[in-house]
C-alpha cells in the first residue's frame, strides 16, 4: 500500500461518521429529559437505584445515521424490594407490570407518538427520528457482595449485567492505549468505520447489528498499524478469514466459559452477506498494492468502500494531494 490515504480517511471519519458534538449533546438532552420524567412520574413507593447508559452511545462507537435514526439505550434499575403491587403491597411486580409502569411514566402530551413497550424495553420516539430504548432492571441484594440484577423482559425476569459490555470495552481500550499510543482510539475509529461500511448501501444490504460488528472488530483489529487506511484494510482482511472459518459471533464481554452466541446459526443471512461484502471490498482494495497505483485509483477504491458522495474527491481538491505520502 504505497500511497497513504490515512489523513483523508481520518478526516472523513471525523466529519461524516463519528457523531458531531451538537448531535451528541442533543441526544444527551433527550436522555436527561426521560430520566427527569421518570423521577417525576414513577410511584413514590418505587425507588430508583441507578440510570444505566448502554450501547454505542455509552462506549462512543455510535455513527451518523441517515434520517437521524439514532438508537439510544438508557436503562433504569430499581431496588427490588420496592417493586411491590400498588393495592396489596405484598406481591412482587411482574416484569410486564414494571415495563407498563415505566411506559406510563415516560408518556408526555408533547409527544406525537407515545412510548411503546417492546420485548426488553420501553421505546420513546422523537420527531427528529431519534428513539430511546429504556430497559428496566431490578437489583437484588443491593449494595452487598451478593448484588445482582435481572432484566424485565417479555418472558419474565432474566439475570443480566447491564454494565458488562461497557466495562469490558473500556478495559479493552485502556489496555490498547497502554501498549501503543492511540491504539484504543484507533480501535474505536475502526469500529465506527466498519459500521459505516456495513450501512453504506442502506437497505440494499442485510447487515448484522452494531454489537455483532463490535465483537468481530475486537477479534480482528490489529494495533500495529499507525495509519488508519492500513488498519482498516487489515481489519477487513482478518475479518474475511475469520468469517471463512466461522460466521458464529460470541459476546466477548462475557467470561469465555459462559459466552452467549449473538448469532442464531452458522448461516444467518446477515452474516453470510457480511462475509460476501467484505470479500467484495477486499477485491476493490487490491489495487492499492499495485506498484503503478495512482492517487485517483486510491481515492476511487476508498470511495467505493464507504460511498462518500464525493467527500474524498473534495478533500483531495482542497488539499492538493498534500496528505499523500509514500509508505515503506
Where are these predicted regions, by residue range?
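Conserved catalytic core of two-metal-ion nucleotidyltransferases
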Residues: 22-25, 38, 42, 59, ...
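Glycine- and aspartate-rich repeat motifs characteristic of hemolysin/RTX-like Ca2+-binding segments
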Residues: 73
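Conserved nucleotidyltransferase catalytic core and NTase-mimicking acidic/glycine-rich helix/loop elements
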Residues: 182, 186-293
Amino acid at each position: 500500500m504505497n500511497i497513504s490515504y490515512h489523513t483523508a480517511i481520518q478526516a472523513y471519519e471525523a466529519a461524516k461518521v463519528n457523531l458531531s458534538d451538537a448531535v451528541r449533546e442533543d441526544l444527551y438532552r433527550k436522555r436527561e429529559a426521560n430520566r427527569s420524567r421518570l423521577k417525576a412520574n414513577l410511584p413514590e413507593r418505587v425507588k430508583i437505584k441507578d440510570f444505566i447508559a448502554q450501547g454505542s452511545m455509552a462506549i462512543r462507537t455510535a455513527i451518523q445515521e441517515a434520517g437521524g435514526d439514532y438508537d439510544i439505550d438508557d436503562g433504569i434499575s430499581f431496588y427490588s424490594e420496592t417493586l411491590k403491587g400498588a393495592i396489596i403491597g405484598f406481591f412482587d411486580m411482574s416484569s410486564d407490570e414494571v415495563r407498563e409502569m415505566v411506559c406510563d411514566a415516560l408518556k408526555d402530551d408533547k409527544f406525537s407518538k407515545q412510548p411503546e413497550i417492546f420485548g426488553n424495553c420501553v421505546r420513546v420516539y422523537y420527531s427528529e427520528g431519534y428513539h430511546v430504548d429504556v430497559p428496566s432492571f431490578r437489583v437484588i441484594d443491593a449494595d452487598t457482595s451478593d448484588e445482582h440484577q435481572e432484566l424485565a423482559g417479555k418472558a419474565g425476569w432474566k439475570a443480566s449485567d447491564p454494565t458488562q459490555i461497557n466495562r469490558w470495552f473500556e478495559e479493552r481500550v485502556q489496555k490498547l492505549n497502554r501498549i501503543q499510543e492511540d491504539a484504543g482510539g484507533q480501535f474505536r475509529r475502526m469500529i465506527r468505520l466498519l459500521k459505516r461500511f456495513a450501512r453504506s448501501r442502506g437497505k440494499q444490504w442485510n447487515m448484522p447489528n452494531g454489537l455483532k460488528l463490535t465483537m468481530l472488530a475486537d477479534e480482528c483489529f490489529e494495533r500495529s498499524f499507525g495509519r488508519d487506511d492500513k488498519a482498516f484494510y487489515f481489519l477487513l482482511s482478518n475479518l474475511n478469514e475469520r468469517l471463512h472459518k466461522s460466521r458464529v459471533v460470541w459476546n466477548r464481554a462475557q467470561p469465555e466459559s459462559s459466552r452467549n452466541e449473538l448469532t442464531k446459526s452458522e448461516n444467518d443471512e446477515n452474516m453470510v452477506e457480511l462475509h460476501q461484502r467484505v470479500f467484495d471490498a477486499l477485491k476493490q482494495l487490491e489495487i492499492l498494492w499495485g506498484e503503478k497505483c495512482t492517487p485517483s485509483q486510491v481515492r476511487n477504491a476508498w470511495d467505493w468502500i464507504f460511498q462518500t458522495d464525493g467527500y474524498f474527491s473534495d478533500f483531495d481538491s482542497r488539499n492538493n494531494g498534500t496528505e499523500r505520502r509514500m509508505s515503506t
